[in-house]
Amino acid sequence: MKEKISLLKRVSIVDDARSILRDMVIPPELLKEKTNGGRITSVCEKSKEGRTTYLEVTGVIDPVDSTAPYIGWKILLPGQWNLRSVQIGGGANNGMIPSLEGAMLMSDYCPIEHGYVVFGDDSGHQSADPMSADFAANEEALQN
């Protein structure tokens, strides 16, 4: 049993994910909350020293209320996945997708370089001002 677990410890996902994810549509029934589904907006290979190290996948989740903003998100998929993931950001009023590349805040640890899937979103509103709460005027945006 230990042999099987050690073989699964690192999983290569970049090659398979790249072709599967391009232009993917996400049906609403796959998402926990009520939405109009979502879609992948870009899949970009990021490389370091001539080799692919991860995929940067961005997308949106469409609201039910046409006046509510979409939820923007980004996921970094490592070339060699350690079967772990970490979410970055999501505090306060949010309003922007945080930087997922590089070291974490107040640390020199870079999750993507250690095989973590790294993800973040804008909580369903887009604002350059993290203290803005204008989104709260829309009930669906407030719930997001």
Report the location of each language-model feature.
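Cap/lid segment of the alpha/beta-hydrolase catalytic domain
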Residues: 92-144
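Catalytic-loop region of hydrolases
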Residues: 1-84, 97, 105
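Hydrophobic beta-strand anchors of alpha/beta hydrolase catalytic cores
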Residues: 84-88, 118
